[in-house]
Structure formats: C-alpha cells, structure tokens
Amino acid sequence: MKSNLSLPSYQGDALLKPAGMPSSLVWLFAVASGLCVANVYYAQPLLDALALDFGISYAAVGGVITATQVGCALALLLLVPLGDIMNRRHLMGMQLLALVSALVAVSMAQSATALLAGMLAVGLLGTAMTQGLIAYAASAAAPHEQGRVVGAAQSGVFIGLLLARVFAGGISDLAGWRGVYLCAAMLMLAIALPLWRRLPTPATTPGSLSYTGLIHSMLMLLLQEKTLQVRGVLALLMFAAFNIFWSALVLPLSAPPYGFSHTAIGAFGLVGVIGALAAARAGTWADRGYAERTSALALMSLLLAWLPLSLMEWSLWALVIGIVLLDLGGQALHVTNQSMIFRTRPEAHSRLVGLYMLFYAIGSGLGALATTATYAHAGWQGVCLLGTVVSLLALLFWWVTRPPLPTAVARP
C-alpha cells in the first residue's frame, strides 16, 4: 500500500535535516502516557481482594478487567477520534479532569455494580488520554523521527502498564485497594500542569468533519487500509496472549504454596520492564525499513515465552525468564505496529490509533475473561496452553499476510 507521506527533497542532506523533538518533551509524552495507561491496569493484581470485598467468585472476577476493556473499546470508537477535529490540548484537559473523577468514584464504590461502572469509566477515560497522547506525539514529531518518538511514548505506556502492578500491589498492602485509586487520582492531578504548559501546538489543524462524518470515516479507513487490518489482528492476538498471562498470575501466586503479598506479586512487573526497555528501539528499526523482521522476532519471542512460564510451579526463575520474553515480544510488536499504521494517513492519526487500539481492547478483554475461567477449570497449565495457542495463531497470521520480499534493484 502506498503511503501518503512524501519524503522531503532535503532528507538525504544531513545539514538540512529538520530539528528533532526536544528530549524533555519526548520524556513528558512517555511519562504522561505511562501514568494514564496505568489506571486501566491497577485492578489486575487486586482481583483476589476485589473478589473478597464484593463477594465475586474467581471464575467471574475477570469481569472487572473486562469492564475496563469495554470502556477502552468505547473510548477508541467515540473519544479518541475527536483529536482529528478538536483542539487536542483542550481535549486532553477535559478528559484528564473526568479521569480523576472516575478514579475517585472507584475508590468509593460500595457495590459490585458501582465498581463495574467505575471501572468502565476508568477504562474509557484512561484509554482516551493514553491514545490521545500517542496520536499527539505522532502528529508533533517530524516524519524522519516519528518512529523514534512514538516508540518512546509507547515504551512509557508499556512500562506504565507493567509498573501499575507494582504500584497497585505496594499501595494495596499499605492502604488497601481503595487507597490505590485515591493515589492514582492524585498522580493524574500532578501531571496535569506539566502537560498543559508543555504540550505543543500540532502542525496539523483540526479537520472540518462533523462528528457523524468522523465516525463514518473510521469505517472507511478500516475497510481501505490493509496495513491497519493486518496490524490490528496481530494486536488483538498479542494482547489476548498478554492478558491471558497477567490477569491469571495473581491467582496461583496468592494461593499456597506461594501465598505472596500483593507487593511481591506486583514486583514481577519490574521484571517486565527489562523486556520493554530492550524493545525500545523497535520504532527506530521500523524507521529504517526493518518492520517485518522486527515483527517476526517479536512474535517468536512471544511464543517461546510460554515454555518457561509453564515451568513456574517448579522454578520462579523460569517465570522471570518467561516474563522478559513475553514483554520483549509484546512491546517490540506493538511499537512496530503503530509506526507502520501512522505512516499511512498523517491527517488521521487519532482515528488510526483509535481503530488499531480497538483490536487491542477486544483482545485484552477476551484474554482476561478466558484466562480466569480457564484457571478455574484447568489451573496454571491450562492458562499456559491457552497462551501458547493464541501466540502461535499470531505468528501464523503474520506469516500468511506478510508482504513479498522486495526484488533486488541494480544500482546505476
């Protein structure tokens, strides 16, 4: 598929290469994205506490995670695309304040119904903020550094996702699960001022589409862009595998013979940071034309991870190795996917990221729901078998949809 991005005539001249985005701004995008996405994942190491507090069975408590993913899906369809027709800076401010309110509401929930409604709102607004920031970063970056900037911001997302479990586990042991969401609300207020002061004015101006026309155009993008279709399905399968692991991990580790605290269980998220940091250059590799090779290696890492993960009952070191492989593969594939889709339609970054992440939300929700039910009936080995099958499907799908190798062109 042809890209709508035209290469500037001066690209080959290093002296005339456009100035890059300041490192401080790249870091702000990464930190803010990480804090926003963490809100969606705080519940994962708290499932046993939530089940006990609200009288929800282990087989059904995965519905708490699914509620956040339903919120994610609604955000991706209804809120994230607004960045293409509204002032992104003002949109960020309104969504951030609404997210703070949703976090406070979760901390005060007194029934399972109120909890699920609050989790849906957190998923809705946390996702809108996160993906809005990713699209913002892509639009603010020059074409020659888009992969690097998106990769850095997405690394912040991935690390925030992983550290959410550490944060939630530690705060829960100190102040209960309700304290986790109160602290999260305070963190969002703390990042509000730096975001408002530093977010740049995007080079692209908001479009003139009506909201109805905007939503309709998303369907057209989904039907027309093969890159989006292929990378979306890969994201669905990859995030299903990712959530199959992380949503189930708390259940065996909190039970005998381990009996780990929430802090100890959440600390396993720190191990995942190693894999995420190792994959941080995936966006740069995509900029250099190695997107398909990176995808293949990432998917193989995702599949191989399930072997050591299945040995957790005999060795926690095997669990550590498996987490590194799983997060390495997931992060590298995710960054590569986004780098590729952002190159298709520069004027539609918010809609593209919304559609792409809709696949992610569906995969995450299905993975969370399937893994808790699988664990209740088949234990940890059943979870690992499920993850292996989903990861293998992702690798096979990439193989049958990969583009043909380019033919060699003789140099003059």
Predicted regions: what they are:
Residues L76-N87, L277-Y290, Y375:
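Helix-to-loop junctions at the C-terminal end of transmembrane segments
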Residues A152-R197:
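Helix-loop-helix hairpin linking two adjacent transmembrane segments in secondary transporters
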Residues L74-A112:
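Conserved MFS/SLC helix-loop-helix module at the cytosolic interface between two early adjacent transmembrane helices
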Residues Y10-A19, P200-G232:
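Juxtamembrane intracellular "pre-TM" segments in multi-pass secondary transporters
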Residues E292-N337:
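C-terminal transmembrane helical hairpin of 12-TM major facilitator-type secondary transporters
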